[in-house]
């Protein structure tokens, strides 16, 4: 119905509205958070991206801007969206706490991590990484990506309280 559609849109814009501001500050912040996740959970990939001047993660921009709409077939996109949005309100395991407040970033990290070996071994420049990442569209298995994303959430959660300490903003994403 129209009212439910409207309020769903309002909720989505509260979550994603910063992605669409003219100065792109919201997207820059998202990419910075993703960069920090890469540094924490995929340090070899982080070092490689640093070496090829790819830490801006612009090759992930489209993923985050349109919430993976151009990366998967529609049925898979809907499953990914459902997982991303329901991760904020997971009640089964976490007594009402969310699994994760930024599941979309863990989905992006899951895609990167699943191709980390190939990227490190065969791609020599930022342009090659960009072309490779864009070539993944409609070639990825959504179930595998979601499983890996969830595992990454738990991996980050398990590091909280250990040395070296996890960045506070990353910590708050998985321990709400």
Model-predicted segments: where are they?
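Helix-rich, well-folded core regions that mediate interactions or catalysis
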Residues: 1-176
């Amino acid at each position: 119905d129209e009212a439910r559609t409207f309020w769903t849109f309002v909720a989505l814009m509260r979550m994603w509205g910063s992605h669409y501001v003219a100065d792109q500050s919201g997207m820059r912040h998202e990419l910075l958070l993703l960069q920090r996740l890469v540094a924490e959970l995929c340090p070899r990939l982080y070092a490689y991206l640093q070496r090829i001047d790819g830490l801006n993660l612009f090759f992930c921009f489209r993923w985050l801007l349109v919430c993976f709409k151009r990366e998967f077939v529609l049925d898979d996109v809907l499953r990914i969206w459902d997982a991303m949005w329901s991760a904020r309100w997971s009640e089964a395991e976490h007594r009402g706490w969310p699994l994760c407040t930024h599941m979309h970033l863990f989905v992006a990290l899951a895609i990167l991590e699943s191709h980390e070996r190939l990227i490190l071994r065969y791609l020599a420049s930022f342009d090659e990484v960009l072309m490779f990442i864009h070539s993944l569209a409609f070639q990825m298995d959504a179930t595998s990506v979601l499983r890996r994303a969830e595992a990454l959430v738990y991996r980050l959660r398990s590091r909280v309280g250990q040395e070296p300490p996890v960045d506070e903003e990353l910590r708050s994403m998985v321990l709400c």
